[in-house]
Amino acid sequence: MNKIKQVVTLLLFCILILSCNRQRPQLPSNKGVETDSNTLSLLTINQNLAKKEDAYLKKVVLQKDKTFKKSEIGFWYKIDQSGRGQAIKDSTICKISCQVSTLNGKVLQNDIKQLVIGKKLVVTGLEEGLKLCKKGDSAIFIIPWYLAYGMKGNEPLIPPYTSLIYKIKVFN
């Protein structure tokens, strides 16, 4: 009788283990992922806010300095001083001095960082901006909120929906 209990227990344990490895059914390729109306509303609101921010930043940047260029992904940049070092690309280890401020000039952060490009260790706008630089460059990036800390911010230092100015120097 004891042997039967052991066999049944072992059998149930094996069935339990095997059922855990079963793949979940996939969504058919002809059906899209359903989103509710609240999600769509929030998406539309954020897209409209991003468009308004882009228009506002364009106005601010062009009033400030017409030598700024707009990147493909939406931030503004200006290389102040061109270095003679290697171009920065993914997997490059670089050391930068970085001053972060709001559009009205309030300095939020001023420090030296060492980072590996492509590892998402800094906000998207800064990482993509650094890829436009060479070692030895000094640059200014004006990064919209959606390429910085987004709608959540980085409280208490950076409020939600805050566009930022990064003044950077890339060391050799």
Where are these regions (language model features)?
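Cross-family detector of peptidyl-prolyl cis-trans isomerase
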Residues: 2-8, 20-172
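Bacterial N-terminal signal peptides
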Residues: 9-17
